[in-house]
A protein has these predicted regions:
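Short beta-strand "wing" residues that participate in macromolecule-binding interfaces
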Residues: 59
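Amphipathic alpha-helical dimerization/coiled-coil segments
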Residues: 1-3, 20, 79-98
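Basic amphipathic alpha-helical segments that dock to polyanions
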Residues: 48-51
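N-terminal helix-turn-helix DNA-binding core of bacterial DNA-binding proteins
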Residues: 2-40, 62-64, 71-73
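Glycine-centered, phosphate/nucleic-acid-interacting loop/turn motifs that mediate DNA/RNA or nucleotide
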Residues: 55
Length: 98
């Protein structure tokens, strides 16, 4: 097979955006991710839960003063999955080069 399968969990636009942010920042707070992705808080929360359930990110809920603070951090499993996704995507782009 010329094409490598794409991870369906990462193929969703918002989850891919979250992973892309975390791959370069390692960790980020929820408001930053929300701002950078242009997502609603509800949708982002659902997508973060899916990534967390898969073990791609870890979510830490703390407080900054009296305000809740959610921090997302990419895991080594998430890094490997993202790298595999990028390589699989390249297999689609390089077909014409062969």
């Amino acid at each position: 097979m010329i094409y490598q399968p794409l991870d369906p969990l990462l193929h969703a636009e918002l989850r891919l955006a979250v992973m892309s942010l975390l791959i370069s920042n390692v960790e980020a707070e929820f408001p930053y991710i929300k701002e950078q992705t242009g997502s609603t808080a509800g949708n982002l929360s659902v997508q973060i839960d899916k990534l967390s359930s898969a073990g791609y990110i870890k979510v830490k809920k703390t407080f900054k003063g009296k305000r809740p603070c959610t921090i997302c951090r990419i895991t080594s499993k998430g890094q490997k999955a993202f790298e595999a996704y990028v390589q699989a995507l390249k297999s689609y782009l390089e077909v014409g080069d062969k």
